[in-house]
């Protein structure tokens, strides 16, 4: 998993509440277990019309936000079914941080496991960030996970909190497999001891 330390980039304001995982990545894209290639289907029902043409009014189709790495969204982001493809699609598109007043619990957890930083902030603060993001490519934000602060385009600093263990995992790029591998010496020692003490249990 890629480390998350400091992210500087354009933030796309998505003024929609209750964005569910089917809106993030529709079910027809769930046939794959690969984490790559899903960015093409991100928000596809919002980004494209029935003919496959882009909807010019959707934020990620606007020139200023096509390369956004931060998404600022409405309340209850990531609700609906617990599909891990949702954070995969965001990450494959290039989104590394999502800011919203609240998140669905499973989506929130899946973000941390896949290298995305979800930040929950009070609604008035999110509205302030969205207003600043309206300036498009002329407004860049910096999200500093180590300092737990968001630097707005005008220099104002917004604090946020991340649970210490999750923060450490993101800073170091540790997913579940990475955490297990960190214990490889202890696992090897345990298996060696088992072979000596209980050889019958190993067949």
Swiss-Prot record:
<comment type="similarity">
    <text>Belongs to the LeuD family. LeuD type 1 subfamily.</text>
</comment>
<dbReference type="GO" id="GO:0009098">
    <property type="term" value="P:L-leucine biosynthetic process"/>
</dbReference>
<keyword id="KW-0456">Lyase</keyword>
<dbReference type="Pfam" id="PF00694">
    <property type="entry name" value="Aconitase_C"/>
</dbReference>
<dbReference type="InterPro" id="IPR050075">
    <property type="entry name" value="LeuD"/>
</dbReference>
<keyword id="KW-0432">Leucine biosynthesis</keyword>
<keyword id="KW-0028">Amino-acid biosynthesis</keyword>
<keyword id="KW-0100">Branched-chain amino acid biosynthesis</keyword>
<dbReference type="GO" id="GO:0009316">
    <property type="term" value="C:3-isopropylmalate dehydratase complex"/>
</dbReference>
<protein>
    <recommendedName>
        <fullName>3-isopropylmalate dehydratase small subunit</fullName>
        <ecNumber>4.2.1.33</ecNumber>
    </recommendedName>
</protein>
<dbReference type="InterPro" id="IPR000573">
    <property type="entry name" value="AconitaseA/IPMdHydase_ssu_swvl"/>
</dbReference>
<comment type="subunit">
    <text>Heterodimer of LeuC and LeuD.</text>
</comment>
<dbReference type="InterPro" id="IPR033940">
    <property type="entry name" value="IPMI_Swivel"/>
</dbReference>
<comment type="pathway">
    <text>Amino-acid biosynthesis; L-leucine biosynthesis; L-leucine from 3-methyl-2-oxobutanoate: step 2/4.</text>
</comment>
<dbReference type="InterPro" id="IPR004431">
    <property type="entry name" value="3-IsopropMal_deHydase_ssu"/>
</dbReference>
<dbReference type="InterPro" id="IPR015928">
    <property type="entry name" value="Aconitase/3IPM_dehydase_swvl"/>
</dbReference>
<comment type="function">
    <text>Catalyzes the isomerization between 2-isopropylmalate and 3-isopropylmalate, via the formation of 2-isopropylmaleate.</text>
</comment>
<dbReference type="GO" id="GO:0003861">
    <property type="term" value="F:3-isopropylmalate dehydratase activity"/>
</dbReference>
């Amino acid at each position: 998993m890629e480390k998350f330390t400091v992210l500087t980039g354009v933030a796309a304001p998505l003024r929609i509440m209750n964005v569910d995982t089917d809106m993030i990545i529709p079910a027809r894209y769930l046939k794959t277990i690969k984490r790559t290639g899903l960015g093409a289907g991100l928000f596809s029902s919002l980004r494209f019309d029935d003919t496959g043409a882009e909807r010019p009014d959707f934020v990620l189709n606007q020139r200023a936000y096509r390369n956004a790495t931060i998404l600022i969204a409405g309340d209850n982001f990531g609700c609906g079914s617990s599909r891990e493809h949702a954070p995969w699609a965001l990450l494959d598109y290039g989104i590394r941080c999502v800011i919203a007043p609240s998140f669905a619990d499973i989506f929130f957890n899946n973000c941390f496991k896949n290298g995305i930083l979800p930040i929950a902030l009070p609604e008035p603060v999110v509205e302030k960030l969205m207003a600043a993001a309206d300036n498009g490519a002329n407004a860049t934000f910096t999200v500093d996970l180590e300092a737990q602060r968001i630097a707005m385009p005008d220099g104002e600093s917004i604090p946020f909190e991340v649970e210490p263990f999750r923060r450490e995992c993101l800073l170091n790029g540790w997913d579940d497999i990475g955490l297990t591998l960190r214990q490889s010496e202890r696992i090897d020692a345990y298996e060696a001891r088992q072979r000596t003490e209980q050889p019958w249990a190993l067949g």
